[in-house]
Design a protein with these regions (language model features):
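N-terminal intrinsically disordered, low-complexity, charge/repeat-rich segments that act as generic
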Residues: 1-14
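Generic short beta-strand segments
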Residues: 14-21, 45
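Short glycine/threonine/proline-enriched tight-turn/helix- or strand-capping micro-motif at secondary-structure
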Residues: 22-26
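Short, conserved turn/kink motifs that form compact alpha/beta structural patches or helix kinks used as
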Residues: 27-124
């Protein structure tokens, strides 16, 4: 296993949590709120099996990823991670979204946290 260095953390990653908000018409809508932003490394790995799956009758991509960040105790499985990859023609951010599947401290040293994720698409 390659030793991790702080310089390997070159992606800005924002952790979000799903919540419900009420709009002006008193309807409840699900949305995500930003919790914190950290530096991290995003790596793909193909050893997790078939990356294609059938979604609503069409082929979609569910790409497994490993995200490494500095150790934190406040990560939860019901969060998601987003990474800005650019902007669209309106100037709005284009985001890659990752659902958290599992996480662990690989060396039990409280230095690094490896998060197994599933990429779920652009702009969540």
């Amino acid at each position: 296993m390659k030793k991790k260095r702080t310089s390997d953390l070159r992606h800005r990653l924002t952790f979000q949590k799903k919540t419900e908000i009420q709009d002006e018409e008193l309807n409840w809508n699900q949305t995500y709120i930003d919790l914190f932003t950290v530096w991290g490394a995003v790596e793909g790995f193909s050893s997790l099996g078939n990356n294609e799956s059938m979604i609503a009758g069409a082929w979609g991509v569910k790409s497994p990823k490993k995200i490494t960040i500095r150790f934190r105790q406040d990560i939860q499985r019901d969060m998601r991670i987003v990474k800005q990859v650019g902007t669209n023609e309106k100037g709005e951010p284009v985001l890659r979204a990752f659902d958290i599947l599992d996480f662990n401290d690989p060396e039990d040293s409280r230095v690094w946290l490896e998060i197994m994720c599933q990429e779920v698409g652009l702009n969540g």
